[in-house]
Amino acid sequence: MRFKATAAPAVTLLRKLVFAIGAGFALNCCADTFVRDDIITDPDPAQFNICHDQGCASLTWVRLSAEQWQRVRSVFATPAEAPPEEREQIRSAIALLETVVGPMTGTSSDLGGTWPGFGLPGQMDCIDESINTTTYLRMLQKYGLLRWHGVVDRATRWSLFSWPHTTAVIEERSSRRQWAVDSWFLDNGERPFVLPLETWRDGWKPPQKEAAGGGGVPGAVIK
């Protein structure tokens, strides 16, 4: 089930670009500032929403069936015995949620990165991806599926020579070490990269063969 709210009847490519840039700069001003005030920040499988079309220009309300949510819960059926194992479960759960939600929101064909599918319907930039991944993580946390990690504010990295980039973040409960959960580099439904946040902040990018469209096994956890 879905209900779509679009920021404007016809959002031009220029407006999308300006919106995405502006959203990135806004994230540097305060903790986890979302780009719209109608984003559900306490999501539930029965009611949450998904950003798409760059900079959350479009927002679609989604409801999972009991069967769909049970599929997600089953990823955690065997409790993780250590944080690394749970990070693998998180990767699988995020990929599954993207696969289930894609047909409801028109985002099944989302391509990794911003530019390969820029301007096409249902495409996502890092603002969309980081908000959506945070939404999924919050639902997992809300239903007690995360034993070793908690969900924290998103993070943005800045560079003089490239665009700002934003990711979802989890924190290991025992060590307080934070991990980036970054699905932006990958096509819809692929398991996201999970890596130490400090490594991600240093400008980390995946090897070309692991990035979207490059073949290989995408989304490996970086130790």
Stretch-by-stretch model annotation:
Residues 2-18:
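Bacterial N-terminal signal peptides that target proteins for export
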Residues 33-54:
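Short N-terminal segments immediately surrounding and downstream of signal-peptide cleavage
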Residues 52-59, 64-82, 110-119:
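Acidic/histidine-rich, surface-exposed loop or edge segments in extracytoplasmic proteins
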Residues 89-149:
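Mid-length scaffold segments of soluble, non-membrane domains
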Residues 138-200:
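Hydrophobic/aromatic-rich core segments of domains that either
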Residues 202-223:
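Low-complexity, Gly/Ser/Thr/Pro-rich intrinsically disordered linker/tail segments
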